[in-house]
Design a protein with these regions (language model features):
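Predominantly a Rossmann-like dinucleotide-binding segment in NAD(P)-dependent oxidoreductases
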Residues: 1-91, 221
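Conserved loop-to-helix N-cap of the C-terminal "lid" that shapes the substrate pocket in Rossmann-like
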Residues: 34-38, 197-204
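A general structural signal for well-ordered alpha-helical segments in protein cores
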Residues: 41-42, 183-185, 211-212
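C-terminal glycine/acidic-rich active-site capping loop/insertion
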Residues: 61-92, 98, 102-105, 120-202
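Conserved short beta-strand elements that form part of the metal-binding/catalytic scaffold
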Residues: 109-111
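A short beta-strand motif that forms part of the nucleic acid-binding face
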Residues: 113-115, 146
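C-terminal hydrophobic helical "lid"/dimerization subdomain
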Residues: 204-218
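Terminal low-complexity tails and localization/encapsulation signals of metabolic enzymes
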Residues: 222-227
Length: 227
């Protein structure tokens, strides 16, 4: 990809508020889609960029549809295909959030996350976290779990699908129906001291700090600078 200078981390649900547990209770959950599903998109994007040094973060969280829509107007269908709705009277987390992340190497990441937003789910994501990377030699995005490389071949723009799953081109993973089982194996081996984690605790902390900074920036209206 060359020098990756721009990226997008996205996890959008047009209507997909989790109605079980404490997801819509800020006192117990801490936040809404940003901390629930946005974290997966950001984690994937940072990992693919292999860049974790942040300059500053600015962002906004929105509390619009979660409290605005009465149950009969929510139009939400759960994963089993049944009509489902949330209680808009007790909903007190954001329903969507956006963040702008400036890295110390000059690269920029735009993060979008939503449980409820009047925007069609794009890029064929099929209710998944996906990433888009833009570099000087080519670009890469993840489409329904596949990696799509756009580059130049024989002086012509070309699109190449890389493996049948994003995990297929990450060292240590193999293409298959359940890459999550590989994640479990790697985690257990790391606990036993038999191998290393792909994502370190320090890298995971950067993800958490970015999300917290988006919430802080939304509250204060100011960017949050990292050390």
């Amino acid at each position: 990809l060359g020098d990756v200078y721009y990226a997008e981390a996205t996890y959008l649900r047009r209507r997909g508020v989790p109605t079980w547990g404490v997801f819509t209770d800020k006192s117990k959950q801490g936040g809404g889609p940003l901390i629930d599903i946005g974290t997966h998109a950001l984690d994937l994007t940072l990992f693919l960029m292999n860049s974790y040094e942040v300059d500053y973060v600015v962002g906004t969280s929105f509390e619009k549809l979660g409290t605005l829509l009465d149950p009969e107007f929510q139009g939400q269908v759960d994963r089993m295909g049944n009509q489902n709705s949330w209680n808009n009277k007790t909903y007190d987390v954001e329903d969507s959030a956006v963040g702008h992340i400036k890295m110390k190497n000059g690269a920029v990441i735009n993060l979008r996350a939503a449980w409820a937003i009047n925007m069609a789910e794009d890029n064929g994501a099929n209710n998944e976290a996906y990433a888009t990377l833009v570099g000087t030699k080519g670009g890469l995005d993840t489409v329904s779990g596949q990696a799509r490389l756009n580059h130049v071949v024989a002086s012509q723009p070309a699109i190449t699908m890389v493996g049948n799953k994003v995990a297929s081109y990450i060292p240590g993973f193999s293409a298959g129906p359940a890459p999550v089982s590989k994640e479990h194996d790697i985690w257990v081996k790391a606990l036993r001291g038999e191998g290393d984690l792909f994502v370190t605790a320090d890298q995971a902390f950067v993800v958490t700090r970015i999300l917290d900074s988006i919430y802080e920036s939304s509250r204060t209206g100011k960017p949050v600078y990292f050390d």
